[in-house]
């Protein structure tokens, strides 16, 4: 692995690691966050496509690419809602664990991954590590019945959101184009969902329309971080860079940065014991991610 490949591989660490913290710091409601983030991603993707002269997909390639973006936006709305419930430092490890579980199970049952008894045994061990790690990251020394109920609700919501994240990663596999050509249509799908969601909130009334709130457009900045991470991951996963396996592992390190910056910069405090358990949980999740791609 050369220095250039390593730097590109660490792009998702910075982009996806800082994205949840920046989006939470800028503030606003989930509708503001998804609208701004999607617009930021669209701007980034459009500029990238124009600079590189990428042809715009058509037919089913376009459909599945847009569907991918729709899935991500739906899932991200749920994740943003969970940020308000339990904080990004707790939500991110859980949603990362669900994404790893979803991707692994999809690969085993539908793509023929992990052939042989040994591979399946190692894979099952990795999945157990993921679940243990996720549980450890949300552990609390003192938790009231009310906060425990909120946590359970958030975890269930994040599990539902995994359907959207699964569509985000699985839909492009049905196309005949690479990730860079799918990037702009994905962003269009994200904006479609964000605009519809914002319109529904506006029509329902009772709340300020997100279209006229400044915070919605401030969130464009957080969208640049998400888009940067998505693009550098696509480049990192190329065979002549880090390859899919190493690129994926490097990208998953973002959960560590997202969790720690949420604790340090958003006031999502943990006791010394909770911090120790959280870090161990993060290590288990990363170890499991490494196992799943090395089988």
UniProtKB/Swiss-Prot annotation:
It is found in: Cell membrane. It is a multi-pass membrane protein. Pfam families: Sugar_transport (PF06800). It comes from the Bacteria. The keyword Phosphoprotein does not apply. One of its GO terms (molecular function) is carbohydrate transmembrane transporter activity. InterPro entries: Sugar_transport. This is Putative ribose uptake protein RbsU. The gene is rbsU.
């Amino acid at each position: 692995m050369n220095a250039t490949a390593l730097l590109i591989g660490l792009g998702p660490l910075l982009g996806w690691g800082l994205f949840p913290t920046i989006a939470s710091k800028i503030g606003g409601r989930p509708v503001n966050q998804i609208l701004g983030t999607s617009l930021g991603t669209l701007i980034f993707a459009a500029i990238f496509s124009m600079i590189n002269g990428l042809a715009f997909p058509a037919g089913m390639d376009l459909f599945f690419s847009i569907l991918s973006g729709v899935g991500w936006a739906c899932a991200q709305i749920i994740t943003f809602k969970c940020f308000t419930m339990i904080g990004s430092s707790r939500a991110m490890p859980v949603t990362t664990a669900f994404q790893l579980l979803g991707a692994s199970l999809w690969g085993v049952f539908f793509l023929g991954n992990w052939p042989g008894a040994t591979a399946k045994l190692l894979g099952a061990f990795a999945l157990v590590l993921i679940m243990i790690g996720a549980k450890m990251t949300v552990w609390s020394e003192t938790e009231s019945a009310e906060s425990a109920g909120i946590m359970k609700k958030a975890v269930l919501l994040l599990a539902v959101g995994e359907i959207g994240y699964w569509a985000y990663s699985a839909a492009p596999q049905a196309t005949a184009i690479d990730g860079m050509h799918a990037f702009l249509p994905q962003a269009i799908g994200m904006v479609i969902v964000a605009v519809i969601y914002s319109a529904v909130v506006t029509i329902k009334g009772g709340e300020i329309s997100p279209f006229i709130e400044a915070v919605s457009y401030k969130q464009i900045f957080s969208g640049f971080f998400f888009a940067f991470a998505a693009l550098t991951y696509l480049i990192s996963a190329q065979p002549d860079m880090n390859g899919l396996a190493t690129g994926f592992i490097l990208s998953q390190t973002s959960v560590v940065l997202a969790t720690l910056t949420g604790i340090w910069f958003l006031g999502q405090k943990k006791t010394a014991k909770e911090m120790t358990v959280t870090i161990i949980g993060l290590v288990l999740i990363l170890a499991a991610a490494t196992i799943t791609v090395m089988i």
